[in-house]
Every structure is written in structure tokens, then in C-alpha cells.
Amino acid sequence: MELLFVSLLSLFLLILLPLSLLFLFPSSFSTTTTEANKNSANLPPGLTGWPVVGESFQFLAAGWRGNPEKFIFDRIAKYSSYVYKTNLMLERTAVFCGAPAHKFLFSNENKLVQSWWPSSVNKIFPSSNQTSSKEEAMKMRKMLPNFFKPEALQGYIGIMDTIAQRHFAADWDNKDYIVVFPLCKRYTFWLACKIFMSIEDPKDVDRFLARFNLVAEGLLSIPIDLPGTPFHHSIKAAEFIREHLVAIIKQRKIDLAEGKASPTQDIMSYMLLTPDEDGKFMKEYDIADKILGLLVGGHDTASSACAFIVKYLAELPQVYQGVYKEQMEIAKSKGPGELLNWDDIQKMKYSWNVACEVLRLAPPLQGAFRDVLKDFMYEGFYIPKGWKVYWSAHSTHKNPEYFPEPYKFDPSRFDGSGPAPYTFVPFGGGPRMCPGKEYARLEILVFMHNLVKRFRWEKLIPDEKIVVNPMPVPEKGLPIRLFSYDA
């Protein structure tokens, strides 16, 4: 029966789905006037794959099989080019690979290209349809620096350490076996709830987390809103979270008016009290939508990084010992009950090198799409307006030209000035570089500190498969056996 189901599903995907999508999204597949008039232009080499869906399934399947870079490097080799064309996510796409391509794209943000997400994202976050993605990004980036500037970040360290201690006490201590990935998600989500919304009660955090996972799973799914599909579950989960966020926002407005809440205590208060250039304040629904988006970016990537740190430290005892030695020197310098501070974070140089090597080998952000704003030429190839460009982190992270022996775990790559510019891009680059990069660094290092001073561990599934959908995740969640230093 299972084989029959798979066969029927394959038939649907390969035949019926393309035809359905053609009727649902006809504008996505029509030939533009610009392209028709310039059909003799030198487009990049490549194939667009199956009608309508193109090579989307090959692209996604490479990740499902745990080898997302195969799609990228196979085509680089096939076309002997670091730029090639394909069809991804129902869009004609030029894939840009290598450090020079990264530099070109990041340097031309909002000039030749701008941020773009598949239509599934806009349907899950409806307020993003009211303005352009460029305008949305500019609004958010004007708000976020106040919360990610150095003095603000320094104030988060003690909060992060407190929550990390509570997290390990509740979910790790006195356990013989745990499954790592869901616990890492709980840790980073707890932090995001506290710092973005001042929510720290574990029960309130867990109420959101289960549905929040459904939101993340649907972001890059096929945008068909039918019962049972990941996209449908994602929309419903987002509606549930948004409804509860609006209730929290309404109460916050009352608390601010009565002096029970501070105007600067978190991002929620700031959004409520900060008008735009026209003197207008954001609506409650829009604030809920923005906070939902921040929660996606504020915890999913770090949770993946934390889980893979656990994975690699289990596999590499000598690396674990280096991290343990560094963190115990810091721990021994602290008084009873004294929390981590900025000076402690600055001493975690080897630990951060290890984290960076994890981010190189298993980047949470595999790459990103850009919308082409106007025709341009790159490396002699014509890229038409309206196409999408996809840049890939793997095209540099696992390229021996930039990282010799690219599959070897070597934290020393990040000693001194580190990798060459535009080769290490786990947080993107240019104006679109993740504004929460330093925030992520803090939550990862605080996690590592509290982890290694408590435990050693070993993997229960030595060769556990890694799947990418859309971020890398151990297929079984990374079950481990814990050995407590207090035991």
C-alpha cells in the first residue's frame, strides 16, 4: 500500500500538479515582453527542468537526502559556470555561486536586486502584502538596531544565562537520554519570547511553540492551501499565534498606559510607541505579524546551530575538550550565582571558532532568493528583469578553492582575520545581512557554556541522517546519552 501511495503521489507531482499550478498561477509562467524581445541575449547556461515546476523537486530532494550542495555543484560542473539558469519555486531563476557572485549581489541590494520570498511567505504573513518587501525591510531595519546595538546586547547576556540555566535544569538535568533538536528549539524560542515580548513562563512559551513549528515548516512549501498540506497547517498555525499575540498586545497597551510596563522593555513596546515617518502607529494586527516574523528569524536558525554543535562535539572529543577547557576557565572565575557578562563572552574565542565551523558545514541559511529589479549583465550573461536570483552558501562554504579540505572540521580556519570576504556567509551579507547576527552569537555561546560545564554525551545513532527542509535537521532529532559531571 505504501508503494502504491508513493507511486500515485509521484504521478500527481509530475503530471497533475504542474497542470494545476499552470491554472492557479498563469502569470508566473508566461514569457515576458522583455524576454521575447531579447531572446537572442546570452542567458546563463542551464535547463529549466519539468514544465512549470522546473527543477524545484530536484533542488528540494537534494536537501531531503542530506546533500543540498549536490544540486549546486553538479550544475557548476555540468555547465562549467558559476552562474546558471533553472526554475525554482515556480520562478525562472539564475543561480549565482562563489565569492565574486556573493559580492556582486550583496553590493547591488536595492539597486539591481531586492529581497524576495515565495508567495507562500506572503500568505502566511499577510501584512507583508500591504507594502513592498523593500519597504517592509527598511521599516524593520530602522526598528531593530535599537535592540541589537552593543549596549542592548550586553544587557541580554544575563537574561540569556538565566534562561539557559532554567532550561538545562528543567529539560536536561537528571536525564539519561534526551532528543536534542526539539530542546534546542525550546531554548531559543524561550529566549526570543522573553527578549521580544517579555514572556518567560514556560507554559506560555510551550503554548506557542507547538504551532510555531508548523508555521516554519510551511514557509517554503508548495503554496496550495488545501486541508492536510503543510502550507494549510502553516496558515492555520500562524492565525492562531497571531490571534493570541493581538491579545497580548492589547494588554501591553493597557499596561503601558498604567505605567506597569516600560516603553523600552522589549520590541513589542517599541513597536507600539514608535510612529513611522508619517506619524502613524502600527496596527495591533501588523505588530503581531511582525513579531511572528521576528520569532521565525530569532530562534529557528540558532536552534539548528545549537543542535549541530552538540552533534559535532559528540563526534570530535578533542574539539569538545578545547571548548570545555575554555568554558571551565570562565566558570571558575565566577562567584556563586554570578551570571555571564560581556567580558566573559569576549573570552570565548575558541568556542566561537567552533560554532563558526559548525555554521560553515551546516548553515541554517542555505541561501536566499532575490528579485531582479532591472536587466543587468554579469560575467557576460544577461539576467532579465523579473527573474529571480538564488545565491548559495554551500557554493563557497564547501568549495575547496575557499576552504581546503572543505568537509574536514577545522576551527582554526577562523583564527586571525578568518576566511576571505564573501566566502563565509551563514548570515547573508550586504544590507540584507541578518541584523540579529550578534544576538545569535550570544545565544549560541551562552548555550555552549551551560552545556559543556554540565555534561559529556554520546550519540545514540552514530550515522544519523541529516535532512534539509529548509534548514538542516537530524532526521531523528539527535538522541544522545548524557553523562553529568555532578553524577
UniProtKB/Swiss-Prot annotation:
<keyword id="KW-1133">Transmembrane helix</keyword>
<keyword id="KW-0503">Monooxygenase</keyword>
<dbReference type="InterPro" id="IPR036396">
    <property type="entry name" value="Cyt_P450_sf"/>
</dbReference>
<dbReference type="InterPro" id="IPR002401">
    <property type="entry name" value="Cyt_P450_E_grp-I"/>
</dbReference>
<dbReference type="InterPro" id="IPR001128">
    <property type="entry name" value="Cyt_P450"/>
</dbReference>
<dbReference type="GO" id="GO:0020037">
    <property type="term" value="F:heme binding"/>
</dbReference>
<dbReference type="Pfam" id="PF00067">
    <property type="entry name" value="p450"/>
</dbReference>
<comment type="similarity">
    <text>Belongs to the cytochrome P450 family.</text>
</comment>
<dbReference type="GO" id="GO:0016020">
    <property type="term" value="C:membrane"/>
</dbReference>
<feature type="transmembrane region" description="Helical">
    <location>
        <begin position="5"/>
        <end position="25"/>
    </location>
</feature>
<dbReference type="GO" id="GO:0004497">
    <property type="term" value="F:monooxygenase activity"/>
</dbReference>
<keyword id="KW-0479">Metal-binding</keyword>
<dbReference type="GO" id="GO:0016125">
    <property type="term" value="P:sterol metabolic process"/>
</dbReference>
<dbReference type="InterPro" id="IPR017972">
    <property type="entry name" value="Cyt_P450_CS"/>
</dbReference>
<feature type="binding site" description="axial binding residue">
    <location>
        <position position="434"/>
    </location>
    <ligand>
        <name>heme</name>
    </ligand>
</feature>
<keyword id="KW-0812">Transmembrane</keyword>
<keyword id="KW-0472">Membrane</keyword>
<keyword id="KW-0408">Iron</keyword>
<protein>
    <recommendedName>
        <fullName>Cytochrome P450 716A75</fullName>
        <ecNumber>1.14.14.-</ecNumber>
    </recommendedName>
</protein>
<dbReference type="GO" id="GO:0005506">
    <property type="term" value="F:iron ion binding"/>
</dbReference>
<dbReference type="GO" id="GO:0016705">
    <property type="term" value="F:oxidoreductase activity, acting on paired donors, with incorporation or reduction of molecular oxygen"/>
</dbReference>
<keyword id="KW-0560">Oxidoreductase</keyword>
<keyword id="KW-0349">Heme</keyword>
